C-alpha cells in the first residue's frame, strides 16, 4: 500500500462525526472511518501478496485486532471524548499515522519529497500535504487548535483542583496541575493549555530539520557542528530487535521505529538524551521503559496502536513534551481522563508530582585523608569520623561547609519543571536545608544564594540557637534599592561556632566598585561593557581558632553564572585575590611575598567554572597567560599582569580527585563549586564524598525530595600545619 497521507486540516470543534471532524476526503473517509480499522486491515490483507510484505501483513493484522478492541479506543465507550479537542487531535493524528503503515522509511521519503518540492518552488510555497510528516501535522494542528476561538473554554472540563500535597502512599483520585505551573489560570481547560503550548511552538523553537538548514546559513564564525546527520528512520522494515549500538548514537534527535514488530524498547534508550521525536507506533509493545523518562528533551512521542496500558512515573521528567500519541492502546482510563482534561502538560505534572519515593541508599560518606593527602578510611558520616580522630588532630583542625542553597526566587516552576511542585516549594526546601546543614555540625558554614530576608529571619535565628555567629553581604544591587526590595536580593553569608572561633576582622568585596577604586584602574571596553554591570560579591572574615590561637581567613563568593562571560569570572577572581593580598599585608603582618603564602586561607563558593576554565587555572597556577576564556579580552592592568596573584592555593578535593559533579541539571552537570586553601598553612584531613552514583543516575536534575538545592554541599576538614602563623602579628578590628 502506498497511499499518501490524507489531505487533512484541523477543523473547529462543535458537533459532527469523527469523519467530519477529521476533514478527510470522502474517498478516503469511507474505508478509514466508516468501515473501521479492522475492515481496513482486512481489505489490505486481501491484496495480492506481492504488494504487501509479510511483516506488513502481520502488522496490519495486529492493527485490526487493536481496532476491534474497545479498550484501545475509549471514545467507543465514552462518546463525549469525540467532542473533546484533545482526543480529537489523538484521532486525527492516529489516522494519519495509520496511512503510513507498510511504507518503508516513510519519514525519509516524506522529507525527501518536502526538500524536492521546496527546491522546485524556491521555498516560496508550503509543501503539499503528501510531503508532510506526522510531526509536521502535529505542529500544524496544535497551532491551529491553540489559535481557534471556537475551541470551548469550558470550566466543566477542568478537574476539581484539589491541592496536591506530599503524595507518597496516598492515591490521588482527581489529580490537578499545580496552579503556579499553569500560570494561575482559573480555568485550566484544554484550550488554555494549548494556548500555553503555542508559545513553545513558536518560530524560535527550531526543530532539527530546520537546524540543518540553519547551520548551512550560519555565520562563518559560528561553532561548527561536526555531526551532519541527526535522524534514523527504520519505519516499516519488519524489525524485531534493536541492536544496542543504535543507542550509542547519543546525537540523535529523531528516531522512527514505527510499523515494526518490536515487543520492547531496551533500557539503553536513556542514552539518547538529545532525542526530540520518537515514533514507535504500530509495534507490539506492552510497556514503555521507565528509562525513556531520561530523554527529557522529547517533544513528540508517538506510540499509536500498541498494547501499552500505563505510563512510567519517570515520564514526569518529560517537561518538554508537546504531544503524546497514545490512541489505539488499552491505556489506563485515569491517565486518559487527565490527558483529556489537563492536556499533556497536566499529565506529565501528575506523573511527576505523584511518583513513588526513590530512597537514598545511604548518606554521603566522609573520607579521612592522611598527612600525605591520601584517603585512608571512609566513615558513614562526619560525626563518626570525628569520634575516631586522635586528640592532637582534633585540637589542631576545623571543619568547613560550602553550599549554594538555591535562592527561592530563582527556584521557579518554570525553571525547574522536572521537580515535583511540593518538593520545589520554599517551605519544604528550607526545612530540608536546615536539617542538612545542622546535621553536618561544621565549625564554619559558608552559604551562597541566600536572600537578605532569609538570612535575617531564618538562618541567623536558627544557627544562633546552635551556638553560631554570622555575617552577611548582599549583591551590589541591594545598595541601590528600597529596603523592601533589597530584602529579596541574595548574597553570601558565613557562620562560625562561638566555641571554636572568635571573629577578628570582617570585610566584603563588591567586585566592580572595588576595581574602580584600584590605583591602576583603567576604563577598558571589556570592563565597561562586560564586567561593570555584574553585581557579584565576596565576603571575608578573619577568625581566631580558640584551641590553637591560630588565625584563618575565610572567604566565600558566588561568581557570575553565564558561560559566555568566563572572562568576567576570571577578572572577578583576579580582583578578589588582589584585594585579599592587600588585606593580608594590612592585617596579617606580612613582611615578604613568601609570608602571605604561609597564612591560613580558605576561599570557597560557587565559582560557576569548570575544571578546564581560566578561573581554575588561575587558582592552581597563580596566573593565566593564554586561555580561550580570556582570548581577545582586555581588562587593563589585570590582563597586563596575566591576572597573577602571589598566593599558594589548591582545591581541597584535588588530592583525591574532584567529585563527579557539584551541580546537577538537565542541561548541565559538572563541578563548579570549590574549596581552595593555602597549601603552606593548611592540610586537608577529611572530605565529604560523592552522592551515591546509582541514586544520582535516576534523576535528570536537582533539587528533589531528598536534596533541596541544585548544588550539593562541599565539606572539608583542615589541619593547621605547625607554627603556620605563630610569628604573624594579628591586629585590626574592621567590621562591616
From Swiss-Prot:
Signal peptide: none annotated. SMART domains: LRR_BAC (SM00364), LRR_TYP (SM00369). Its main location: cytoplasm. Residues 1-52, 160-182 are annotated as: Disordered. Its cofactor is Mg(2+). Its EC number is 3.1.13.4. Residues 160-177 have a biased composition (Polar residues). It is found in: Cytoplasm; Nucleus. It is an enzyme of class 3 (hydrolase). It comes from the Eukaryota. Keywords: Activator, Cytoplasm, Exonuclease, Hydrolase, Leucine-rich repeat, Magnesium, Metal-binding, Nuclease, Nucleus, Repeat, Repressor, RNA-binding, Transcription, Transcription regulation. GO terms for biological process: DNA replication; DNA replication checkpoint signaling; nuclear-transcribed mRNA poly(A) tail shortening; positive regulation of transcription elongation by RNA polymerase II; transcription elongation by RNA polymerase II; traversing start control point of mitotic cell cycle. The keyword Transcription applies. It catalyses: Exonucleolytic cleavage of poly(A) to 5'-AMP. Mg(2+) binds at residue 449. Acts as a catalytic component of the CCR4-NOT core complex, which in the nucleus seems to be a general transcription factor, and in the cytoplasm the major mRNA deadenylase involved in mRNA turnover. Ccr4 has 3'-5' RNase activity with a strong preference for polyadenylated substrates and also low exonuclease activity towards single-stranded DNA. This is CCR4-Not complex 3'-5'-exoribonuclease subunit Ccr4. It comes from Eremothecium gossypii (strain ATCC 10895 / CBS 109.51 / FGSC 9923 / NRRL Y-1056).
Amino acid at each position: 500500500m502506498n497511499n499518501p497521507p490524507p489531505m487533512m486540516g484541523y477543523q473547529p470543534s462543535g458537533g459532527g462525526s469523527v469523519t467530519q471532524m477529521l476533514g478527510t476526503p470522502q474517498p478516503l473517509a469511507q474505508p478509514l472511518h466508516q468501515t473501521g480499522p479492522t475492515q481496513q486491515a482486512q481489505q489490505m490483507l486481501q491484496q495480492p501478496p506481492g504488494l504487501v510484505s509479510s511483516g506488513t501483513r502481520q502488522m496490519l493484522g495486529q492493527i485490526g485486532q487493536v481496532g476491534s478492541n474497545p479498550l484501545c479506543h475509549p471514545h467507543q465507550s465514552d462518546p463525549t471524548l469525540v467532542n473533546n479537542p484533545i482526543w480529537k487531535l489523538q484521532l486525527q493524528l492516529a489516522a494519519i499515522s495509520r496511512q503510513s503503515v507498510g511504507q518503508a522509511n516513510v519519514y525519509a521519503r516524506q522529507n525527501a519529497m518536502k526538500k524536492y518540492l521546496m527546491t522546485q518552488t524556491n521555498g516560496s510555497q508550503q509543501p503539499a500535504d503528501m510531503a508532510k510528516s506526522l510531526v509536521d501535522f502535529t505542529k500544524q494542528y496544535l497551532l491551529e487548535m491553540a489559535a481557534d476561538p471556537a475551541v470551548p473554554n469550558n470550566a466543566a472540563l477542568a478537574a476539581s483542583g484539589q491541592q496536591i500535597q506530599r503524595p507518597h502512599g496516598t492515591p490521588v483520585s482527581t489529580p490537578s496541575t499545580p496552579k503556579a505551573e499553569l500560570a494561575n489560570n482559573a480555568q485550566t481547560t484544554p484550550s488554555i493549555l494549548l494556548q500555553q503550548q503555542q508559545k513553545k511552538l513558536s518560530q524560535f523553537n527550531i526543530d532539527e530539520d530546520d537546524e540543518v538548514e540553519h547551520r548551512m546559513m550560519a555565520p562563518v564564525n559560528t561553532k561548527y557542528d561536526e555531526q551532519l546527520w541527526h535522524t534514523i528512520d527504520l519505519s516499516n522494515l519488519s524489525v524485531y530487535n534493536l541492536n544496542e549500538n543504535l543507542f550509542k548514537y547519543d546525537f540523535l534527535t529523531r528516531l522512527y521505529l514505527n510499523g515494526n514488530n518490536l515487543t520492547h524498547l531496551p533500557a539503553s534508550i536513556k542514552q539518547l538524551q538529545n532525542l526530540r521525536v520518537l515514533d514507535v507506533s504500530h509495534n507490539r509493545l506492552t510497556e514503555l521503559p521507565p528509562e525513556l523518562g531520561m530523554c527529557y528533551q522529547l517533544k513528540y512521542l508517538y506510540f499509536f496502536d500498541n498494547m501499552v496500558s500505563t505510563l512510567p512515573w519517570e515520564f514526569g521528567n518529560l517537561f518538554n513534551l508537546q504531544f503524546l500519541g497514545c490512541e489505539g492502546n488499552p491505556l489506563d482510563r485515569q491517565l486518559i481522563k487527565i490527558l483529556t482534561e489537563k492536556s499533556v502538560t497536566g499529565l506529565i505534572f501528575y506523573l511527576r508530582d505523584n511518583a513513588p519515593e526513590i530512597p537514598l541508599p545511604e548518606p554521603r560518606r566522609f573520607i579521612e585523608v592522611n598527612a600525605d593527602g591520601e584517603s585512608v578510611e571512609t566513615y558513614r558520616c562526619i560525626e563518626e569520623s570525628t569520634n575516631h580522630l586522635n586528640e592532637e588532630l582534633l585540637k589542631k583542625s576545623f571543619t568547613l561547609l560550602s553550599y549554594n542553597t538555591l535562592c527561592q526566587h530563582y527556584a521557579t516552576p518554570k525553571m525547574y519543571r522536572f521537580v515535583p511542585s511540593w518538593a520545589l516549594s520554599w517551605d519544604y526546601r528550607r526545612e530540608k536545608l536546615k536539617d542538612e546543614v545542622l546535621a553536618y555540625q561544621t565549625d564554619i558554614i559558608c552559604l551562597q544564594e541566600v536572600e537578605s530576608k532569609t538570612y535575617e529571619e531564618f538562618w541567623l535565628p536558627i544557627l544562633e540557637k546552635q551556638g553560631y555567629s554570622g555575617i552577611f553581604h548582599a549583591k551590589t544591587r541591594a545598595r541601590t534599592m528600597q529596603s523592601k526590595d533589597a530584602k529579596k536580593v541574595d548574597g553570601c553569608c558565613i557562620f562560625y561556632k562561638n566555641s571554636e572561633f572568635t571573629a577578628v576582622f570582617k570585610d566584603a568585596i563588591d567586585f566592580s566598585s572595588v576595581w574602580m577604586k584600584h590605583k591602576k584602574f583603567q576604563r577598558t571596553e571589556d570592563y565597561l561593557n562586560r564586567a561593570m554591570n555584574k553585581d557579584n560579591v565576596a565576603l571575608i572574615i578573619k577568625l581566631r581558632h580558640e584551641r590553637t590561637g591560630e588565625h584563618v581567613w575565610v572567604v566565600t563568593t558566588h561568581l557570575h553564572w553565564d558561560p559566555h562571560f568566563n572572562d568576567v569570572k576570571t577578572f572577578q577572581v583576579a580582583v578578589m585575590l588582589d584585594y585579599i593580598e592587600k588585606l593580608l599585608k594590612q592585617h596579617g603582618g606580612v613582611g615578604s611575598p613568601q609570608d602571605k603564602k604561609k597564612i591560613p586561607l580558605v576561599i570557597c563558593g560557587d565559582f560557576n567554572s569548570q575544571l578546564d576554565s581560566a578561573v581554575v587555572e588561575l587558582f592552581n597556577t597563580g596566573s593565566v597567560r593564554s586561555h580561550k576564556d580570556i582570548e581577545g579580552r582586555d581588562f587593563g592592568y589585570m590582563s597586563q599582569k596575566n591576572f597573577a596573584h602571589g598566593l599558594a592555593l589548591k582545591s581541597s578535593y584535588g588530592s583525591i580527585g574532584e567529585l563527579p559533579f557539584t551541580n546537577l541539571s538537565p542541561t548541565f552537570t559538572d563541578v563548579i563549586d570549590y574549596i581552595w586553601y593555602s597549601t603552606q598553612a593548611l592540610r586537608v584531613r577529611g572530605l565529604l564524598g560523592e552522592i551515591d552514583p546509582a541514586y544520582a543516575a535516576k534523576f535528570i536534575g536537582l533539587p528533589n525530595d531528598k536534596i533541596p538545592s541544585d548544588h550539593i554541599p562541599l565539606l572539608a576538614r583542615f589541619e593547621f600545619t605547625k607554627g603556620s602563623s605563630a610569628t604573624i602579628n594579628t591586629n585590626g578590628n574592621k567590621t562591616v
